[in-house]
Amino acid sequence: MACFLNIGRDHISPIEHPTFEDYFESKLRIFDQAKTAVVNLGTEEVDRVLEAASTAERLVTVGVEHPEASLWASDVRMVGFSIEFNLHGLCADESEAGEKILLGIAGDFNVENALVAIAAAREIGIGIDAIKVGLSKFRVPGRMEVVESKDGRVVCVVDYAHNQLSFRSLFSSVKRAFPASPVIALFGAAGGKAQERREQLPREAAPYSDLMIFTNEDPAREDPMKVCRELAENVPDDTPNKIILDREAAVHAAFKAAREEYINPDAPTIVLLLAKGDEELMHVGDEFVPIESDLSLAHRLIDVTQFD
């Protein structure tokens, strides 16, 4: 079975793919030996994906608000820090409302992930009741982890988002969930690859951010200050931004700004710690250096109210 969720203009560098076309064609090869293909109709280049998937013996399609799909979701809604939606296509005699699904992870973009997982599970004979239990308890360490301060003034989201597609999904989802909240976004860009991210990421983040903090993120053999300056050079308009190379110090500064500068008395301030998730290693030079994970830093620092 081969599942195709999405395609973005990423992974193009001297050590990855030379062009987007090469990357896309490589990704489409997942269907070459698949008896069953699962395709998200919400992906870019969907016609080419469906053409490649047509070689499979069985094609299952999924999508959000795509009634033409084999399985599709409607009425996506936030329930606290979880997501609920109605699932259609399970059987011919289902109710018009469909099956109610609770997804125990934040981010409405995760509905597409869930639909692909549901389709794959159904294809191998797993029943919907077991699927519903699994999705309701689903958690990936460092993936859309929500940490809320005890006083409710700050909500931190820790996620592995690190490219244009994941940034677009995450930031738009956060804005829909917290439309009145100031947003502080902390991120960097990896060294030695995917040069285009240094232009794309600040441009994706800026429309949603009140402050961007650029910091160290797996620089490898590149100068991390150079990477951060290139990010800063691509900030559109006049979105406030700063560079703090030390990642722990940058996280500390983000929470300080959330407490002292970027405040809405009627809504929590959102702090986004992006790209590193629950990782405890940083790629520096030719080594992987131990660090405290973003998730650990969030839990440790979110309730600090006194700053130097």
List each model region and its residues.
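Residue-level signal for inorganic ion chemistry
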Residues: 5, 23, 38, 73, ...
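Flexible active-site lid/hinge loop adjacent to a nucleotide/diphosphate
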Residues: 1-52
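Transmembrane helix-bundle segments that form internal channels/tunnels in multi-pass membrane proteins
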Residues: 40, 91-93, 104
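ATP-dependent carboxylate-amine ligase
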Residues: 58, 116-142, 146-308
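Extended acidic/charged loop-beta regions that coordinate divalent cations
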Residues: 1-14, 48-100, 133, 140-150
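Short gly/ser/thr-rich secondary-structure transition/capping motifs
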Residues: 18-22, 67, 138-140, 195
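Short, polar loop motifs at secondary-structure junctions
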Residues: 41-45, 64-65, 278
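A conserved, hydrophobic alpha-helical segment in the catalytic core
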Residues: 1-9, 99-139
